[in-house]
Amino acid sequence: MPVKCISVLLLLLQLSCCFSSGSCGKVLVWPMEFSHWMNMKTILDALVQQGHEVTVLRSSASIVIGSNNESGIKFETFHTSYRKDEIENFFMDWFYKMIYNVSIESYWETFSLTKMVILKYSDICEDICKEVILNKKLMTKLQESRFDVVLADPVSPGGELLAELLKIPLVYSLRGFVGYMLQKHGGGLLLPPSYVPVMMSGLGSQMTFMERVQNLLCVLYFDFWFPKFNEKRWDQFYSEVLGRPVTFLELMGKADMWLIRSYWDLEFPRPLLPNFDFIGGLHCKPAKPLPQEMEDFVQSSGEEGVVVFSLGSMISNLTEERANVIASALAQLPQKVLWRFEGKKPDMLGSNTRLYKWIPQNDLLGHPKTKAFITHGGANGVFEAIYHGIPMVGLPLFGDQLDNIVYMKAKGAAVKLNLKTMSSADLLNALKTVINDPSYKENAMTLSRIHHDQPMKPLDRAVFWIEYVMRHKGAKHLRVAAHDLTWYQYHSLDVIGFLLACVAITTYLIVKCCLLVYRYVLGAGKKKKRD
C-alpha cells in the first residue's frame, strides 16, 4: 500500500510540475489514413507522455484512425455522409490500378492516374471538411476547448482552415507530395530543378543533361498542369467560410512549422527553410525479442541468416503468377525467409519460406541474423532498414516508393527491380548481390551511422518543435517573406522590368543626345561650307 501511495504522489508531483511550468498544451489533430496515421500517432503518443492533451478529429468513416484504443489520446468523432467501405474501396481501387494497370516507371501513365485520384480524393476531403466546419455544435466545442496548436497532415486538406478559424498556430507533418508541390507552393521551399530531382521522377542527384531536361519537364508539368488538389474549389470554399478572398495555398503558407518525415541518410542535399525540419525515422527503435516460434525459425537458419519480405500494410496479396515467381526465387536461397503475405499459398513456396499475415518488421530488421530486406520502398520500411543497417531489394509500386529505392540504390544500399516484369532469376540474383557483396552491407551501415549520429532523436525533434510553436504562440519569425510577395515579385520580374526600362530609357537618351550632337555638328559644317 505505501508503495502505491508513493507512486501516486510521484505521478501527481510530475503532473503538477508540468502544469506549473506551463509546458502542457492542448493539441488538435487533423490526420490522414494508413501509414500517415502510424507516423502521426507516434508523435501523439510522445506528446501525451510529455503531459499534453491530444484530441484527434476523426470521421465516422475512418479506416485505421482510432481503430485501437490508444491510451491517452482523445478522439472527437464526427458524422460523415461517406461510409468506411466507400473510402476503403476508393484507396484499394487506386492501389490496384497503380500496381497492375500502369508502370511506375512510365511517367505519363503514373501522373495521369495520380491526377485523377487526387481530384477525386480532393472532393472527398472537401466534403468531409465541410461536415466539420458547418457543424456548429462541433465547432463551438472546439473553440471553447482553447487549443494551443493544430497538428495536421497537409495531404488531407482542412487543417489550415481549422487553424485559421480557431486563430491558433499550425504545424504540418508529412513525408511529401507529388512533385513537392505542397512544400514548394504552400511552404515556399526552393527546389532548383538543376540538381534537386522532383518527387515521383525516379531521378537521382547526379543527373545527366537529358535527365536534367526530364526533371525540368516534370517540374513544369507539376507547376502548370498538375492539380494541387481541386484548387479552385478549395479557394472558393475557404473564401466563403472566412468571408474574404483567400486561397488554399495562402492558408497553407501560414503554417508555422513543416515537419518532414525524411532525413539526409535518405535524401540528397537540397535547400531548406528555417521553418522546415527533418524528422524521418521517428518511429524507429531498438529491436525487441521476437515471438518464440518466430525466433526458433530465425535461429534455425544458422550462419546463412534470414531474409525479411514485406510489401507494406496496404498490399495484402499478389496475383498467383507474381506470387509464384517470387516464391520460386525465394526457394532457391540458402537463407530462411519470413514473408508477410495474406493471399493464396503459392504452389512454388519452398520449405525455407514461411508466410505470415503480420510480422514485427522493426524487430526482424534489428535481428543479428537478418541479411536482406525485400521491400516496396515505403518510407517507414526504408527508414527501419537504414536504422538497423540492412541492405534492400526494392520493388516500388506507387507514390514516393520509386524515389526512395532510387535514392537507396544511388547510395549503394539497394538493388531496384520491377515487380511486374521481373523473373525468378532477376529476384534471386538481386538477393544474392545484396547478401554476398559486402559493399551493400557496408553502405547500409554507413547510412545507419549517419542516422544515429544526430544531436537529437527525430521523435524528440518533432515534439520540441510542436512545443516550441505552443510556447511562442506560433513561429512567424521563421517564416520567409516570400509568402507575402506576388509571383512576379518573387521572381523579381518587376525589378528586372524596372532595370530594363532604366537601361532602355538611358540608351534612348544617349542615342538621342548623340543624334542631336551629330546634327548640330553636321549643320555647323554645312554652314561653314556655304560661307
Curated annotation (Swiss-Prot):
Q: Extract the CDD domains matched here.
A: GT1_Gtf-like
What does the entry list under GO cellular component?
A: endoplasmic reticulum membrane
Record-linked InterPro entries: UDP-glycosyltransferase (IPR050271), UDP_glucos_trans (IPR002213), UDP_glycos_trans_CS (IPR035595)
Reaction catalysed by this chain? glucuronate acceptor + UDP-alpha-D-glucuronate = acceptor beta-D-glucuronoside + UDP + H(+)
Which Gene3D superfamilies does the record associate with it?
Answer: Glycogen Phosphorylase B
The EC number on file is 2.4.1.17
Regions that span the bilayer: 495-511
This entry's Gene Ontology molecular function terms read: glucuronosyltransferase activity
Q: Which keywords accompany this UniProt record?
A: Endoplasmic reticulum, Glycoprotein, Glycosyltransferase, Membrane, Microsome, Signal, Transferase, Transmembrane, Transmembrane helix
SUPFAM superfamilies assigned: UDP-Glycosyltransferase/glycogen phosphorylase (SSF53756)
Residues modified by glycosylation:
N69, N101, N317
Membrane topology reported for the UniProt record: Single-pass membrane protein
What does the UniProt entry say about where the protein is found? Microsome membrane; Endoplasmic reticulum membrane
What family is reported?
A: Belongs to the UDP-glycosyltransferase family.
The job of this chain, per UniProt, is described as: UDPGT is of major importance in the conjugation and subsequent elimination of potentially toxic xenobiotics and endogenous compounds. Acts on small phenolic agents such as 2-beta-naphthol and 4-methylumbelliferone as well as bulky phenolic compounds like 2-hydroxy- and 4-hydroxybiphenyl. In contrast to 2B16 it is active toward octylgallate.
Write down what this protein is called.
UDP-glucuronosyltransferase 2B13
Question: Gene encoding this polypeptide?
Answer: UGT2B13
